[in-house]
Amino acid sequence: MYSGQSSPTFKQQSRRVAIMAFRDLLAGAVEVDEPISVNHGMLNHSESINHKAVVFNNITEADGLRSAVNVLARDRLCEIFNISPGELIDILAWAMANPSEPKLVDSKNAPVLENTQDTVDLTKLPIPWHYPEDRGRYQSASVIIAQYQGVRNMSFHRQFLRDRNHCVSRFVPRHLRTMTDKARANGEEIDIAVVNGPDATVLLAAAMSFTHDLDELTVAAALHEKLHGKPLELVKLTNGIEVPADSEYAMEAKITLADDDEGPYVDITGTVDDVRQEPVIQYDAVHHRNQAIFHALIPAEVEHRTLMGLPRAPTIKAAVNEVVPCSDVYMTDGGSGWLSAVVAIEPKQEGDGMMAIKAALHGHGSMKQVTVVDTDIDCSNPVRVEWALMTRWQPDKDTLILSNQKGSSLDPSRGEDGLTSKIGIDATLPPGIDRKPYESVL
């Protein structure tokens, strides 16, 4: 049996690039100067150009402010940082294991504080209403940084724009929900910052989930140091919360004791999520850069899948590496970046494919399907993956089906008890076999 982690593939000395701020990620994006409305306009235009990265320079309801969509995709991030997908996964895993402290800077060195709204009015920001099925305008790419009783948390939470200074935010049962419940039990509100458009290292760290109280900003700092060769710089807002200094927006707010209706909302699977009573957030100040660019992520599209799925890849790869060498993990588009993955391995002995399937499903408990392929197959290419299935997989002996497994809340087909069945497909060649009849010249 293979044991132990494989060595990281990235080369530390050659992976530092000058691109740091969110707006730097927009190099090469489509520029749209025609008037675009926050009400369905961004989604409609994005669909018309096949969801390429795009910057909207003329938002009808937000004079002088801009927005961007389709910025974060795995291939695009790898191209920008000049790394392979496998290296990106290894760097994410390294940062999780090696958190570091960010650097606090003075307010005069923080671009995010270049402008402050005279009176808070969120309706004047480029907050989009993408799908007609949504309740209304939503922040979907903003992260919440909260601190309570010495614990800091940074995470994504969608926010429905209720009125000029209030949003209603969906808190799933994770760390921020636990923090909020604890504060409410004490009759206390929580001071927070809502950050939109930080650099990619912050966005990736905010999308990670940990079983313990690990400060996501320290993971972002490690990523920033590895990819940029510089510390992640934070600035302290007047409410005491520290935020990335080069973010596009930093908004001072508090989680109140009140709840209100949140939803419906088109979630990552493209299905419509329910209406629930969720916490109300009151906004007290809005700061932003000059000509700020609002990150207006489109739910169920490429950025949503990237931010949901990419941070799961390191945990899956680590789990698989415990039993067999693993070179890549790709959370598939058809699985909404969450429910299905393709895993590339190098089998060493008979049965390694099945071992890899079980390890991958353990590494990401929400996953419903995993396909294991050889390292000569591009995990991100569905045509090549299907080719591997058709030429290397025998359904009656290379398939694992598990019943009565804990399912994902994002899967509407799961049972009322939350249980589902899961499937693993082994499309690898047996070790030692003559590979020539199975190799493609295409």
Predicted regions and their residues:
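Accessible peptide chain termini
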Residues: M1-Y2, M20
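Low-complexity, intrinsically disordered or signal/transmembrane-proximal segments
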Residues: Y2-Q5, Q12-Q13
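Extended, highly charged
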Residues: F10-P264, G270-V280, D284-L442
